[in-house]
A protein has these predicted regions:
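Non-catalytic propeptide/linker segments at domain boundaries
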Residues: 8-11, 16-79
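A metal-dependent hydrolase metal-coordination microenvironment
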Residues: 65-197
Length: 197
């Protein structure tokens, strides 16, 4: 999940590992941990494949062809029930995308927005739900969801890299401006939960 399917071309690649420092501090305290990364040319089965629609092509852009933006899930007007703030194993959730979809369907939801911390899903499993691409922009100053995203926010890597620094305000302002320009819906998450300011 969260990967971009396709060839891995020869060249220099960088691997970014996002660690939520607030969770590390809660779980480890002053202890240290070790991250081991093994690179191999062996092809293994993917443990949590998309098993459905791939939303991206040629990078992290969700195009008109790869996501059915014009699809009508229910032609009738009325009240619809859904979840605008969810997490899977891609960030700090505990569920696979398949299990999350099953639970949402069993709960009678009409729509579901996966909003991972500073990450976006690149596809979703087959489901009757309207699944809308989203992201939770996560900083030490607060969290903001973006709904209906068509690509990763341009400043997301800077936001992750410079979290806790003064420059973060500039990157957040730029992200809000980009969201407004692209027509993405913005929502401030848990504004009164003081652990995340």
């Amino acid at each position: 999940i969260g990967g971009v399917p396709g060839e891995i071309y020869p060249g220099t690649w960088k691997i970014g590992i996002g660690i939520f420092t607030e969770y590390v501090a809660q779980k480890l305290g002053e202890q240290t941990g070790e991250i081991v990364l093994t690179v191999s040319d062996r092809k293994d089965e993917v443990s949590d494949p998309i098993c459905g629609e791939c939303w991206v092509e040629n990078g992290l852009h969700i195009s008109e062809k790869s996501y059915r933006w014009e699809n009508v899930f229910c032609p009738e007007s009325g009240w619809y029930m859904g979840d605008f703030h969810t997490h899977t194993r891609l960030s700090d959730g505990k569920e696979t995308i398949g299990h999350a979809s099953e639970r949402a369907e069993e709960s009678g939801l009409d729509f579901y927005v996966p909003t991972e911390h500073n990450l976006m899903h690149t596809g979703w499993c087959k489901t009757s739900l309207c699944v809308l691409p989203g992201i939770e922009v996560t900083t030490d100053k607060g969290h903001m969801n973006l709904f209906g995203i068509t690509e990763m926010p341009e400043k997301i890597l800077e936001i992750v890299k410079h979290n806790g620094e003064e420059i973060i305000d500039t990157y957040m302002d730029q992200t809000i401006a980009q969201a407004k320009q692209k027509g993405w819906i913005r929502s401030i998450n848990h504004p009164f939960l003081t652990i995340w300011k």
